[in-house]
Design a protein with these regions (language model features):
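Interaction-mediating elements
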Residues: 1-129
Length: 129
């Protein structure tokens, strides 16, 4: 958790996929404090997108963060992705939807709610995915 699904009309090159995954991971972790091993990015190629769009990014994120944090996350991702691919914000559709933490497992363990990470014994011992 989170899972970001990146859909494009054409396949991205492997270097662009790696760079985009690292960008998404870095932005998500800096803003939310999530461990890097929690961030997942999946690519879907040759997807018909709405006219004018080059990319669609759908992020499933843990429910319970503030609306302000989610807005900062969304806006920062939009700014950085459009800069990386030299596109306007009208060519990128990026949205986040919240998923309850108890619906998700990482390494066979149920995720803690946002803000309760310090009470999570398995996470404090170190999470290695």
């Amino acid at each position: 958790m989170p899972l970001y699904t990146v859909s494009t009309g054409r396949s991205l090159s492997v270097p662009n996929r790696k760079a985009l995954a690292n960008l998404i991971m870095d932005v998500h972790c800096v803003i939310t404090g999530a461990p890097k091993t929690f961030v997942n990015v999946m690519y879907c190629d040759n997807i018909p997108l709405e006219d004018g769009l080059q990319m669609n990014v759908l992020g499933a994120v843990r429910k319970g963060r503030t609306a302000e944090m989610n807005a900062t996350l969304q806006n920062t991702l939009i700014d950085k992705i459009t800069e990386m691919f030299n596109m306007s914000d009208l060519q990128l559709d990026l949205s986040l939807f919240e998923v309850p933490a108890q619906w998700v497992m990482e390494g066979g363990e149920i995720l803690p709610e946002p803000g309760e990470e310090d009470q999570c014994e398995w996470l404090q011992k170190g999470h290695n995915a």
